[in-house]
């Protein structure tokens, strides 16, 4: 199974103090030697990574780069030409991407065409539902990336102590039996979505909220060929170093 390391959270540490440390390019070099691709999200407000980071990584780091960006940031994708662009929704007030892309956006078809004309692979970050899979195929995307955020949130509510903390999600303060049912339902949505996507000749990736404990259920969905993981790897690296954190995740997703 392929691993994309999202290095945005290295930039989060850098921006916490507004200095040039830790060096995002150093993290990219290390990740490129251990993972199959680097994923970087350049947001409209540049709160974490910025276009200079993207430019440097593409210039000096000879690996596959997956740029996450909103439709409104597409000019930078066309300028710098990463290997792949994953189109994601974006809200200025969100801490992290909260849901899948709205595929009913009138601009989407034109944006996809422009990217493909520049030989850039196109991935759509979508919620796991069959309607969006079919639309992604009609839009002629190369990849879909299934949003695993709801799965990860339910897993955390069921198997960690998060519901006893200030980070609890009110809608997931439920009994264990209720959470188990929700978890299985979400896994079934992911399985069905991945199966349909593969049957429509879409490459299938997944990501958001995946960590060292919850990733196994996603690895077991054989139609998913790639995972993009960031926050949990960077969090683990605080204790064991980035190299070991990536290698530990690689071991968990090996088939």
UniProtKB/Swiss-Prot annotation:
Its EC number is 2.6.99.2. This is Pyridoxine 5'-phosphate synthase. The active site is at residues 41, 68, 208. It comes from the Bacteria. Coiled coil: none annotated. 3-amino-2-oxopropyl phosphate binds at residues 6, 17, 209, 230-231. Homooctamer; tetramer of dimers. The keyword rRNA-binding does not apply. Belongs to the PNP synthase family. Pfam families: PdxJ (PF03740). It is found in: Cytoplasm.
């Amino acid at each position: 199974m392929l691993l994309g390391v999202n290095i945005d959270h290295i930039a989060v540490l850098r921006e916490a103090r507004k200095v040039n440390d830790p060096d995002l390019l150093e993290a990219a070099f290390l990740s490129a030697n251990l993972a199959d691709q680097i994923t970087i999200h350049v947001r409209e407000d540049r709160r974490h990574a910025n276009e200079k980071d993207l430019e440097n990584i593409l210039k000096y780091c000879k690996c596959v780069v997956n740029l996450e960006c909103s439709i409104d940031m597409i000019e930078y994708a066309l300028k710098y030409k990463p290997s792949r662009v994953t189109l994601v929704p974006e809200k200025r007030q969100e801490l992290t991407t909260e849901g899948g892309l709205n595929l009913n956006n009138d601009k989407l078809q034109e944006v996809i065409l422009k990217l493909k004309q520049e030989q850039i692979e196109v991935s759509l970050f979508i919620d796991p539902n069959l309607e969006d899979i079919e639309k992604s195929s009609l839009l002629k995307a190369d990849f879909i990336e299934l949003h695993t955020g709801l799965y990860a949130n339910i897993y955390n509510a069921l198997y960690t102590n998060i519901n006893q903390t200030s980070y609890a999600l009110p809608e997931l303060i439920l009994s264990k039996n209720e959470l188990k049912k929700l978890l299985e339902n979400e896994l079934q949505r992911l399985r069905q979505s991945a199966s349909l996507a593969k049957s429509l000749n879409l490459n299938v990736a997944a990501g958001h909220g995946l960590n060292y404990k919850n990733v196994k259920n996603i690895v077991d969905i054989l139609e998913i060929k790639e995972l993009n993981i960031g926050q949990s790897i960077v969090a683990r690296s605080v204790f064991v170093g980035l190299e070991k954190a990536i290698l530990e995740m690689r071991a968990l997703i090996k088939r």
